[in-house]
From Swiss-Prot:
The keyword Signal applies. One of its GO terms (molecular function) is growth factor activity. Residues 1-29 form the signal peptide. Keywords: Developmental protein, Differentiation, Growth factor, Mitogen, Proto-oncogene, Secreted, Signal. It comes from the Eukaryota. Interacts with FGFR1, FGFR2, FGFR3 and FGFR4. Affinity between fibroblast growth factors (FGFs) and their receptors is increased by heparan sulfate glycosaminoglycans that function as coreceptors. This is Fibroblast growth factor 4. GO terms for cellular component: cytoplasm; extracellular space. Its main location: secreted. Belongs to the heparin-binding growth factors family.
Length: 206
């Protein structure tokens, strides 16, 4: 079985392409990094990408925090993250929150527990991470939402844009199950809802 070094080497051409592409389109040579050589800049970006891959199996508390920036073109390769609150317009209106003990529910006000980090896992699939609690949003095979200190397959959610410009989040590991909040702000079981129901509609807010 190939080790981390083999996987890292296999990804190097893609990383080089992403770094050099902006200058290639202008027909010019890539400039050197302000604080060193171009090689040093490439190495820095490469190490950052590999570190995120290798740390995926560690508890999040052991992983370094990284600044989140707004998503744009090329985010899927470089792992660009978005800081958002996910607002569900049910009842009095609730933001999805991840509590320090790993419980997941809704809260009406903007709180530190409702600040989430959305990171692309692959095109159309994201992880949802509680910035304050340091837990990932995850969904079990029975549709129960829970906070996971590790990133696992149950932490992958397919981000679906709906006709009303809200998003639905379908568990990638358990298709047909969606993140949902009740009119009282409680987490609903993902296997008892559908994207046609308002309880599954979330609006990402800054």
């Amino acid at each position: 079985m190939a080790g981390p070094g083999t996987a890292a080497a296999a990804l190097l051409p893609a990383v080089l392409l992403a770094v050099l592409a902006p200058w290639a389109g202008r027909g010019g040579a890539a400039p050197t990094a302000p604080n060193g050589t171009l090689e040093a800049e490439l190495e820095r970006r490469w190490e950052s990408l590999v570190a995120r891959s290798l740390l995926a199996g560690l508890p999040v508390a052991a992983q370094p925090k990284e600044a989140a920036v707004q998503s744009g073109a090329g985010d899927y390769l470089l792992g660009i993250k978005r800081l958002r609150r996910l607002y569900c317009n049910v009842g009095i209106g609730f933001h999805l929150q991840v509590l320090p003990d790993g419980r997941i529910g809704g809260v009406h006000a903007d709180t530190s527990d409702s600040l989430l980090e959305l990171s692309p896992v692959e095109r159309g699939v994201v992880s949802i991470f509680g910035v304050a609690s340091r837990f990932f949003v995850a969904m079990s095979s029975r549709g129960r939402l829970y906070g996971s200190p590790f990133f696992t397959d149950e932490c992958r959610f397919r981000e679906i844009l709906l006709p009303n410009n809200y998003n639905a989040y379908e568990c990638d590991r358990h298709p047909g199950m969606f993140i949902a909040l009740s009119k009282n702000g409680k987490a609903k079981k993902g296997n008892r809802v559908s994207p046609t129901m308002k309880v599954t509609h979330f609006l990402p807010r800054l």
